[in-house]
Swiss-Prot record:
Xref: PANTHER family: TRANSFERASE CAF17, MITOCHONDRIAL-RELATED
Record's function text: Folate-binding protein involved in regulating the level of ATP-DnaA and in the modification of some tRNAs. It is probably a key factor in regulatory networks that act via tRNA modification, such as initiation of chromosomal replication.
Key words, A-Z: Cytoplasm, Folate-binding, tRNA processing
One annotated GO molecular function: folic acid binding
Organism the protein comes from: Escherichia coli (strain K12)
Record GO biological process: iron-sulfur cluster assembly; RNA modification; tRNA processing
Keyword Cytoplasm listed: yes
Cell location: Cytoplasm
Descriptive protein name: tRNA-modifying protein YgfZ
Amino acid sequence: MAFTPFPPRQPTASARLPLTLMTLDDWALATITGADSEKYMQGQVTADVSQMAEDQHLLAAHCDAKGKMWSNLRLFRDGDGFAWIERRSVREPQLTELKKYAVFSKVTIAPDDERVLLGVAGFQARAALANLFSELPSKEKQVVKEGATTLLWFEHPAERFLIVTDEATANMLTDKLRGEAELNNSQQWLALNIEAGFPVIDAANSGQFIPQATNLQALGGISFKKGCYTGQEMVARAKFRGANKRALWLLAGSASRLPEAGEDLELKMGENWRRTGTVLAAVKLEDGQVVVQVVMNNDMEPDSIFRVRDDANTLHIEPLPYSLEE
């Protein structure tokens, strides 16, 4: 990608975030085009893509035959097919899996590094973008297209926008916003996704979890009414037989080091500590607070105390902006 990422700054929690323009270089774009695009994706992901409108985007999972997620995909209609955004670390293996049956269909599946991914969030983000685009997405219309640009709207943790565009428009946006917006890199968007409870699947956790272990059902990313797709039997069994005992949690507190994706944490049990969970992502905020996204048992006590392994500091559970009650 020729567009140069912005230098990193310590991320800020959404409640205190000034207007910020971010380069999302830790995320990557991919597309499927061709006459069979919809049918093909319908047989591969957990969401009902046939019901997706032009002005919708959603988080779906692409699973293996055992129902474990290769990746999750932020999916939207693009041209005569679909585009999706996923973590860059999983894009290549995910596309390899997705292409396995493509020889039998009229589809072309490819990475897209021509377009640039930008995020806009923070204080008066809508007002800042309103001067640059004739229409902005909203709760009622979550995807808006204008020329070479697609804008995606997110409600949580506070209103923000993801922009998929060409290099020329990305440069124009940077020039126009440079004076009033702080510039930051992917870590700020990652911090917002952790706060929003959007599961982050990097390479370390690819092929490890069924979608429900990362709350995908609560985020509208699983259809239990659609036809067959890879891994469907296991995903359905987890729902109808209560086989899923895990959930995605948000922890906050202090830690002397950031836990890495795939690492476990420790849970306080009386005077002792017991290993628990799998970290999906973690970020240290500019106020020193550490936020951690972790998959653990779904019956954790709300006042449980955790720590990064052998650390002197502790982490506690924070509420997510959505309910897990079905």
